[in-house]
Amino acid sequence: MNYMQDNDKLYRYLFQDRAVRGEWVRLNQTFIDTLNTHHYPNVVRNLLGEMMVATNLLTATLKFNGDITVQIQGDGPLRLALVNGNHRQQIRALARIDGEIRDDMSLHQLIGKGVLVITIAPQEGERYQGIIALDKPTVTECLEEYFQRSEQLQTQLLIRVGEYEGKPVAAGMLLQIMPDGSGSPDDFDHLATLTATVKDEEIFGLPAEELLYRLYHEETVELYEPQAIQFHCGCSQERSGSALLLINDDEIDEILEEHNGSIDMQCECCGTHYFFNKEAIEKLKKSGEEPVTTH
């Protein structure tokens, strides 16, 4: 069986005799697309991968249409790490760096004084925001505690980030006791112990069915149809134009003069360039029409 068939997929599964549910996700091309236009240090790349997997696993627990933003803000050299995902498993991520970053830096050294913020935004209904202390060695451990505290359910979160066959990969598993109260703590602990034995080459390189069999071959596991995951930025010429109009006219004229009559707006997330000349900006102001581009 070709392991690549389960790249960029999210699977849900149920341990039928244990009243415990699970999720498994692996990001391959999605992770590559996210990193594509950036040259992040390895430690930042790995942190973004960890946060992306966590966001995918979080969005899979939503019982409504909407999106989740997982964000770290601090006063260290990594000022911001942000991941946004929705119920369609479309995801994007970015980081902002201000200072020197070494690959041997701990999470605390990267972030300094900071917090982890989770914002859940349903398409209908009120937004919810949770603020989590970054008081553990990894984001995964901080988020695992968040899951357990917010849902009052035993939860295991396991995330690995690295390389497989020379390409970046991020993968993770979530285990959670069912909310109906029918599961026992002993059953959960037994499955969590099995889950913790997973090797990098297994979580990175096996198809879902084979991975689950390897870990839980004595269990009855019902595996549901997967959901595809993809990188999706959502930027557009129109959005860039709207942002440009927030700048005052004198400053726009100055930028146009400095850059040979064309302003280059680059998306911070995906790196796409949007170009605006004087004519395009005037049209934006007067009519709200989509701007004319110059390349």
From Swiss-Prot:
Family matches, as Gene3D superfamilies: helix hairpin bin (1.10.287.480), Hsp33 domain (3.55.30.10), HSP33 redox switch-like (3.90.1280.10)
Keyword Disulfide bond: yes
Annotated localization: Cytoplasm
Gene Ontology BP term (one): protein refolding
Pfam family, one: HSP33
Disulfide cysteine pairs (residue numbers): 233-235, 267-270
Annotated keywords: Chaperone, Cytoplasm, Disulfide bond, Redox-active center, Zinc
Record's keyword annotation contains Disulfide bond: yes
Database matches in CDD domains: Hsp33
GO molecular function: protein folding chaperone; unfolded protein binding
InterPro entries: Heat_shock_Hsp33 (IPR000397), Heat_shock_Hsp33_C (IPR016154), Heat_shock_Hsp33_N (IPR016153), Hsp33_helix_hairpin_bin_dom_sf (IPR023212)
Post-translational modification: Under oxidizing conditions two disulfide bonds are formed involving the reactive cysteines. Under reducing conditions zinc is bound to the reactive cysteines and the protein is inactive.
UniProt superkingdom: Bacteria
One cellular-component annotation, GO: cytoplasm
Location, primary (coarse class): cytoplasm
Family: Belongs to the HSP33 family.
Record function comment: Redox regulated molecular chaperone. Protects both thermally unfolding and oxidatively damaged proteins from irreversible aggregation. Plays an important role in the bacterial defense system toward oxidative stress.
Protein name (database record): 33 kDa chaperonin
Organism: Mannheimia succiniciproducens (strain KCTC 0769BP / MBEL55E)
Gene name linked to the record: hslO
